[in-house]
């Protein structure tokens, strides 16, 4: 996938000057992170790592990813409303994965008590890579769907101007015009605003559940600012704040001090390390409340790796989406090979195949946040330890996607510009809002491209491996 600026990657002096201009433009545009040394303060900030140039993405696959996003929104919504499917699918996982089990316990408790909320909000991001066939053909294959704390919609809204600037500096104005406009933060805020409106209390606020040490605060502020522009106030709080200042009234309306909360937006709570006993109690209070949760715990469970694997089984999509054969076909076309590791013949066979050809598989736990997957020799060692243990049910196996590498220049604070062979991962942001049984909003709202050096098997921007990027349609 050649581009017209490939030769510049070999000109060290020109690259150095371009990198300076790109970094200054990124800072001016607000492509920012708090510093690693001061993650609780905005007194010292730096630019978020990014590519010097946009990266080539096949136009047809970009269009396909956008076209299927509303189907994925509907699928997540359908799964979240199907307690029998969730219980059956996660039954083996929750026996050996304490984190998923705690989430599921809260889910069951709220179901038993009766769900108070009537407005349901999904802000999802479906992530893909581009499988390269032996004949050079490219195919869109889903890596995962993120249903909680899908990040970088704010910073992704600011990077197109940076790459247009770089190409304009090179007098490549035609190429600069091909950089797609992109504003996920606006679309995410529209979903939150619709849920807030349907909640029906003009004085209620949005509660953003955040970490105390948050380097990626400007990404979150982008959504907050969009809401404030719509006269919707956002308050930030940690789980600890909910425990200390939160309460439910007799109608299960949620209050922080004396402020009623219409929507709870989680930018924390997606990893086991983010919970202690106090935080679990806070999560239960939030789930029991009438406030719209983004996500509620059913939507979070719908985004687990085990659910993703089960959805690939023959007939499952048809059962969950009856009478929608076109949507089923679009969804299934994006599925990579996914394999259960539950105890039994099917799991035994999957492990045997992975041990025989480890370069073709990835071992995935039920975790979000990046950097959790196992590849190659690490995967082999883990499977050898797990193969006779019921603990293997807390993992799934996935076919390893093999994209076509390309060259780009990675820019990171405190490091020299790095010209390397790269691969990219494309994310599409989706928003849906349901009131009762009526879907009142379902749309795609933008994209995120993250790029990393080929030698890194796993890890995103927050994990320090990937960098922000923009698709250059080819």
Curated annotation (Swiss-Prot):
Q: Which cofactors, if any, are listed as required?
A: Mg(2+)
Q: Which residues bind ATP?
A: 144, 305, 364-373, 375, 398-401, 425, 452, 458
- Encoding gene, per UniProt annotation: Gss
The entry's protein name is Glutathione synthetase
Q: Which GO terms describe its biological process?
A: response to cadmium ion
User: Which UniProt key words apply to this protein?
Assistant: Acetylation, ATP-binding, Glutathione biosynthesis, Ligase, Magnesium, Metal-binding, Nucleotide-binding, Phosphoprotein
UniProt keyword Protein biosynthesis, yes or no? no
Q: Which family does it belong to?
A: Belongs to the eukaryotic GSH synthase family.
Enzyme Commission number(s)? 6.3.2.3
Q: PANTHER family, alphabetically?
A: GLUTATHIONE SYNTHETASE
Which top class of enzyme applies to this chain? ligase
Q: Which Gene3D superfamilies match?
A: 3.30.1490.50, 3.30.1490.80, ATP-grasp fold, B domain (3.30.470.20), Glutathione synthase, substrate-binding domain superfamily, eukaryotic (3.40.50.1760), Glutathione Synthetase, Chain A, domain 3 (1.10.1080.10)
Q: Which CDD domains match?
A: eu-GS
Instruction: Quote the function comment for this protein.
Output: Catalyzes the production of glutathione from gamma-glutamylcysteine and glycine in an ATP-dependent manner. Glutathione (gamma-glutamylcysteinylglycine, GSH) is the most abundant intracellular thiol in living aerobic cells and is required for numerous processes including the protection of cells against oxidative damage, amino acid transport, the detoxification of foreign compounds, the maintenance of protein sulfhydryl groups in a reduced state and acts as a cofactor for a number of enzymes. Participates in ophthalmate biosynthesis in hepatocytes.
